[in-house]
């Protein structure tokens, strides 16, 4: 098995150690391997291919980190074909939340979410995806 070195904030490293201890993992590597498998599995879910989807993406970042807000603006414009709606809100005294409603194919939504997740200085990125063809408005 190969060895991979990664950088992360001390706080995240401590959280991984605590998580490993509390959940019976043998160490950080096992936690990171499982997290990577799960993340990759999210983007490789074949059940959602070739279907019309809607997604909600929520991004949390520090108010002082203007580069994140600027990056979100560029992503919104670069992906305007799938961004149905976008909402910006202040959370508490220090944070901003950016919410995107997307409509499109899995490949396009995955590309958007990947770019959001890759944005430096985001504190949290969450999303959910729902096939539009599963929605029965008359039930």
From Swiss-Prot:
GO terms for biological process: response to nickel cation. Binds 1 nickel ion per subunit. The keyword Coiled coil does not apply. One of its GO terms (molecular function) is DNA-binding transcription factor activity. Belongs to the transcriptional regulatory CopG/NikR family. Transcriptional regulator. HAMAP family: NikR. This is Putative nickel-responsive regulator. It comes from Haloarcula marismortui (strain ATCC 43049 / DSM 3752 / JCM 8966 / VKM B-1809) (Halobacterium marismortui).
